[in-house]
A protein has these predicted regions:
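Nucleotide-activated donor-binding/catalytic signature segment of Leloir-type glycosyltransferases, i.e.
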Residues: 234-262, 266
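Carbohydrate-associated surface elements
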Residues: 145, 167, 227
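Glycan-recognition and catalytic cores of secretory/periplasmic carbohydrate-active enzymes
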Residues: 219-220, 248, 370, 376-758
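Short hydrophobic beta-strand element within catalytic cores of glycosyltransferases
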Residues: 297-298, 302-305
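Conserved donor-binding/catalytic core segment of Leloir-type glycosyltransferases
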Residues: 184-200, 206-209, 222-224
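Conserved acidic donor-binding segment of nucleotide-sugar-dependent glycosyltransferases
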Residues: 317, 321-328, 337-342
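A short helix/loop element that forms part of the nucleotide-sugar donor recognition site in Leloir-type
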Residues: 172-184, 189
Length: 758
């Protein structure tokens, strides 16, 4: 039997990785059925690791196409079954949704180990975990509480769930030899190990120590573990520094040792064998599985713990002691009692040792092997496959290389000669606003550090170009001279769009506060916008703002007023055969229905919704032909009752169509819009009137469009940003298409929108 495993894997420092490696090797080394293993390892934040030979492929957590390449590899590998190690945070997308397309394409039985099960999940988390359980042949959990949650909260059939305890290494050291090695002969060792973060409650133990040392001055508390990588990424060593200050203030330097190390299991078990009492002082009950608790009991430690779920379940029948959350006084009483009564301490250690003998990895691995043998012996009932309207494998790898080429410390250069920045043309507000939108989307979806690096560059350009009255200049020369006093209404609207998106998706408070300042300084100008595209862009920005600030009734009123202006333009210009806002189809056409679709979602207005869908259908009729997109040419546009221009075709028009169909899909869940979205995107890659790709696979930029003679090879900011925003939108739509319908829209909301269209 050949098995595939999906999860993190050493040398990546991660508890799930250690679990995956131990499980895989224990099943292989048992020699009872498993003859070959292969691992698909999860990488984080573009990190590469020197994996051992059993790792055949790695997945970049935020790269959706990696998941599809991995499932193709698994399906062709000859593996008989797949084991998925599921933990929130190791799979990409909102709530870890990127794993779903892989599971939907998997052609072999799936066994999923759930390391975390949330009692109060978000809508996304609940729906995604339910879908994973639906796709799994068996689900392994490590506590009875987990079974209760799965059945009661996630509605998983109980017969699908199997309880297999967390495994522990079958490693043993002589206690006295270990104490001698660590020079602990005269000390009473208290120990906590694992990744460090504020939720671990280390300060509870430190605050309890003065009362313990008063009676047991030989006590030593060792905290063994690095700061959790996610904590380190966002807060640095803030928590460890806080602990060090606390230790110093309580004069505990001789009694507390913080070891900032991630050690191997042999070394860890030496510490566990040497310790007198193991402590898990976690601050929250919401931990359904604790690998550190299992390891401590497997090593025969006397465990003292707060009553989080796993501890409350395991530390019964004198296998340990419990104390209340954040209760330093209670902890000191328990520890003093045990240190003063060695016979009680020894009795707990004996019970823990007895339990630990049943959860060694060889025994746990055999349970998994037996489970898979049972699954393979039964005929697999195929689940219905979802139609894959979007194929991410057709997309080039997402890259910011050309954007980096165009960006300096002032902003993004607006034009290019072929793939080289044209410094003579300087900068413009339009493109820096588009660039801000794009990097916000990129960081939200891919956590790309380069996007985070560029974000303040584009935001500071926008701030610099704002006038005292809240309007904006547009053009800036390369030597930083202003070239106009007031920019176009289009550029104003695009800036509000980007700022509105930022306010709902800012990666930190500094960028949020800057964006908020610029946004609200511009608000007094909203009522004076005349151009319909300036209005549309502004409406989109307001809609994004309102999604996270729904109580701002004044801004809702402004959005309604602007939407009514577009609706009024529609009523003034439409005829039986011309369902549009003007007497011509010009440029960036899709943003007009797009703006109304956004407003329809936020305002729940039937008149706005009807005009949005009617005009979208009209635009579709005149731009979708023979299953590809043909955007309106800008030579003479398409004037009512005249011939439409075929050239020049520009990327911003295709981008607007992608965004328009995406918002229609979000509102309705109608997969026909998903198909049209992908068709519109493929315009960039050669499914167009010229049958030529505008995307340059060498420079990673996008050409400026089609002329009647062929491709305009210049690759300016507008075109490349239009491509990247479209690319990100396709990936977002693909992600949404694999979420349950209830994630995208409730049945009631879908029904309401359908009624609004009627």
């Amino acid at each position: 039997m050949k098995l595939a495993y999906i999860g993190t894997y050493p040398p990546r420092e991660c508890g799930i990785g250690t679990f995956t490696q131990n499980l895989a090797h224990s099943m292989l080394e048992n020699g009872k059925g498993v003859k070959e293993i292969m691992v698909i390892a999860m990488n984080d934040h573009n990190q590469d690791y020197p994996y051992p030979p059993e790792v055949k492929l790695s997945i970049n957590q935020e790269q959706q196409t990696d998941y599809l390449e991995a499932v193709n590899y698994i399906n062709l590998s000859g593996a008989d079954a797949c084991i998925l190690e599921h933990e929130f945070g190791i799979y990409g997308g909102l709530g870890g949704v990127y794993i779903l397309p892989l599971l939907h394409r998997l052609n072999i039985p799936l066994i999923t180990t759930l390391h975390t099960i949330l009692e109060t999940p978000s809508y996304n988390e609940r729906a995604i975990l339910k879908e994973i359980c639906k796709m799994s042949d068996k689900i392994v959990v490590m506590s009875h509480k987990a079974i209760h949650f799965l059945v009661g909260i996630y509605k998983v059939p109980k017969e699908k769930i199997v309880l297999i305890e967390h495994g522990v290494p079958d490693i043993h050291f002589d206690k006295e030899e270990s104490r001698t090695e660590f020079k602990l002969n005269e000390r009473k060792l208290l120990l906590t190990f694992g990744f460090i973060g504020r939720n671990k409650g280390i300060e509870t133990v430190i605050k309890a120590l003065p009362q313990i040392i008063e009676k047991h001055p030989e006590a030593l508390y060792i905290v063994l573990g690095k700061t959790h990588p996610n904590v380190l990424r966002h807060s640095g060593e803030e928590y460890r520094n806080y602990l060090q200050v606390l230790i110093k203030s309580l004069k505990l330097n001789e009694h507390v040792l913080l070891l900032n190390e991630f050690i191997d299991e042999n070394e860890l078990f030496k510490y566990l064998s040497a310790c007198d009492i193991y402590i898990t002082p976690y601050l929250s009950e919401a931990q359904i599985t604790s690998g550190t608790l299992s390891y401590a009991m497997g090593a025969g430690c006397a465990v003292v713990s707060t009553p989080y779920w796993h501890a409350a379940e395991l530390l019964v029948e004198n296998k340990g002691r419990l104390f209340d959350f954040n209760d330093s006084d209670g902890l000191s009483e328990v520890l003093n009692e045990l240190l003063e009564n060695p016979e009680n301490l020894h009795e707990i250690q004996e019970h823990a040792t007895e339990y630990g003998q049943d959860i060694t990895w060889p025994k746990v691995g055999q349970k998994y092997t037996d489970l898979i043998t049972q699954v393979l012996s039964r005929p697999k009932v195929p689940l219905p496959k979802k139609e894959n309207v979007i194929d991410p494998l057709l997309l080039p790898p997402f890259s910011l290389v050309h954007i980096k080429r165009l960006t300096d410390d002032t902003g993004i250069i607006q034009h290019a000669k072929f793939g080289i920045p044209n410094l003579k043309e300087g900068y413009c507000l339009d493109d820096n606003a588009r660039a801000l939108l794009m990097v916000c989307m990129t960081y939200k979806q891919k956590k790309d550090p380069l996007a985070l690096e560029f974000m303040p560059v584009y935001l500071s350009y926008i701030h610099y170009m704002q006038n005292k009255d809240g309007t904006f200049r547009n053009f800036l020369s390369f030597n930083r001279n202003f070239l106009d006093e007031k920019g176009s209404e289009d550029s104003f609207g695009r800036t509000i769009w980007a700022l509105g998106y930022l306010l709902g998706n800012a990666p930190n408070d500094a960028y949020y506060q800057t964006g908020k300042l610029v946004f609200f300084d511009a608000v007094p100008n909203f009522d004076s916008i005349k151009s319909i595209r300036g209005i549309a862009n502004t409406m989109i920005g307001i809609s994004y703002y309102l999604r996270t600030n729904a109580s701002d009734d004044a801004m809702k009123g402004t959005l309604h007023k602007l939407a009514n202006i577009l609706v009024s333009h529609y009523h003034q210009n439409h005829t039986e055969n011309w369902e549009w806002f003007e007497s011509l189809l010009a440029y960036d056409n899709g943003i007009l229905p797009l703006a109304l679709l956004h407003a329809a979602e936020v305002l729940e207005d039937g008149d706005i919704s009807k005009v949005a869908f009617d005009t979208m259908d009209f635009l579709t009729e005149h731009t979708m032909k023979d299953d590809y997109l043909s955007v309106i040419g800008n030579k003479d546009w398409y004037v009512r009752e005249k011939e439409r221009s075929m050239f020049a075709q520009q990327p911003i028009d295709a981008e607007a169509m992608v965004l328009m169909y995406h918002q229609a899909y979000v509102l309705t869940g109608d997969r026909d819009f998903l198909k049209k979205l992908f068709t519109s995107f493929m315009w960039f890659l050669g499914e167009n009137d010229m049958r030529m790709s505008l995307y340059d696979f060498e420079t990673k930029g996008c050409c400026d469009g089609f002329e009647n003679y062929g491709v305009n090879r210049n690759q300016g900011a507008e075109s490349s940003l239009a491509y990247l925003i479209s690319h990100l939108t396709v990936l977002q739509a693909y992600e949404e298409s694999f979420q349950l319908e209830e994630i995208k829209t409730s049945k009631a909301k879908k029904s309401t929108i359908n009624e609004l269209q009627d």
